């Protein structure tokens, strides 16, 4: 795990290219175990929609994350789920309010790349 938050330089645009013809998406990345916010898509999401770092959204909207995070996974019966929940350091959250439509598809690419061995606990919360 990257508990000490070692800086592992990775430019996802250098290691990933989508070759699906005629595909237009809002492209986002998770690099190793963190949401990549250094270069976000220029497309705008509808008002009220939240897409981004689970860690940052938990700071900005704690009531939203608290209401949904870890509610479906039973950590008392599954050790792997409990471990992942306990040690997840970031992830992605996608929140779409009722009656709101996101027109452009969102593409989320997870990239694992490092010069050292470490473990990654990923979290994706879709509401």
Q: Where does each model-flagged region fall?
A:
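Glycine-rich and polybasic anion-binding loops at the starts of cofactor/ligand-binding domains
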Residues: 1-127
